[in-house]
């Protein structure tokens, strides 16, 4: 899959999913740092996520945004939903993403909702299965979205026309 240049997409919207304080125990006590999980997207079929770690929260968020812009993926959409049902997996986290009729809205939990909304999906059903750790849910969602295929791609793979595929 080719890399998407964030500079060519224009304005990307950022959403902080989680901020976590982590500690390193040393001889003199605990050293605290912050990790941030951020999702970025243009609400037009491009979305990415990133993580950052720093001694201060704003620095962690800035690093996470930079990381997210390097990890953008393209999401195929049909109207405001996905072309077909997909199951995304990462670690113990699983997410079921199911197309929905117009007017349904985004039915998804916190981290998954952030990814789907910033990808530009307006009508979707989802169910998180397994682990509910935010980073695993985000990774599973993005992994599932990358598995989506357009009708044109499926037709080309099977050596058929789009009309034959659609029935």
Curated annotation (Swiss-Prot):
It comes from the Bacteria. Keywords: Ribonucleoprotein, Ribosomal protein, RNA-binding, rRNA-binding. GO terms for cellular component: small ribosomal subunit. GO terms for biological process: translation. One of its GO terms (molecular function) is structural constituent of ribosome. InterPro entries: Ribosomal_Su5_D2-typ_SF, Ribosomal_uS5, Ribosomal_uS5_bac-type, Ribosomal_uS5_C, Ribosomal_uS5_N, Ribosomal_uS5_N_CS, Ribsml_uS5_D2-typ_fold_subgr. SUPFAM superfamilies: dsRNA-binding domain-like, Ribosomal protein S5 domain 2-like. PROSITE patterns: RIBOSOMAL_S5 (PS00585), S5_DSRBD (PS50881). Residues 12-75 form the S5 DRBM domain. Part of the 30S ribosomal subunit. Contacts proteins S4 and S8. Belongs to the universal ribosomal protein uS5 family. The N-terminal domain interacts with the head of the 30S subunit; the C-terminal domain interacts with the body and contacts protein S4. The interaction surface between S4 and S5 is involved in control of translational fidelity. With S4 and S12 plays an important role in translational accuracy. This is Small ribosomal subunit protein uS5. The gene is rpsE.
């Amino acid at each position: 899959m080719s890399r998407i240049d964030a500079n060519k997409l224009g304005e990307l919207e950022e959403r902080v999913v989680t901020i976590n304080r982590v500690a390193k125990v040393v001889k003199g006590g605990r050293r605290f740092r912050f990790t941030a999980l951020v999702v970025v997207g243009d609400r037009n079929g491009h979305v990415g996520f990133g993580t950052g770690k720093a001694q201060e929260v704003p620095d962690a968020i800035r690093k996470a945004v930079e990381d997210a812009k390097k990890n953008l993926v393209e999401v195929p959409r049909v109207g405001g939903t996905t072309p077909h049902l997909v199951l995304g997996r990462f670690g113990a986290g699983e997410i079921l993403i199911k197309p929905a009729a117009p007017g349904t809205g985004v039915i998804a939990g916190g981290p998954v909702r952030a990814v789907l909304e910033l990808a530009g999906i307006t009508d979707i059903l989802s169910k998180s299965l397994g682990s509910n750790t935010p980073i695993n849910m985000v990774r599973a969602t993005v992994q599932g979205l990358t598995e989506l295929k357009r009708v044109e791609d499926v037709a080309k793979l099977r050596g058929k026309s789009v009309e034959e595929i659609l029935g």
